[in-house]
Amino acid sequence: MKFRNPIFLALLSLAFVCSTSTAANLGGEKHAAKGVNCAVCHGTTNPPIAPETATCIQCHDKKALMEKTSKIKPTNPHTSPHYGDDLDCTNCHKMHSPSENYCSQCHNFEYKVP
């Protein structure tokens, strides 16, 4: 089959590149690298739902995380003086976009958020 329209061919190529890069970069690469598929965090609903902290702590031990970050200064981000340990993980940790320092909305803490 011969394509007579170079614009159609270019669009077809672009669609293929975008779809494959989106599938590879949908986020959660760290989880995928460990064999965790999307449904583990997002369920099987369509469209997928954002995971709640209860989902995160099924695999990520909250007490171990608080201990691991206990020496971070000026304060441990996982034991907030405002929220205790009840702050949603997704306030800082984003799998499908850059993570952010939720505390920096009010404070000048220089946390590096994975």
Tell me the role of every PLM-derived stretch.
Residues F3-F8, F16-P114:
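Short sequence/structural segments immediately N-terminal
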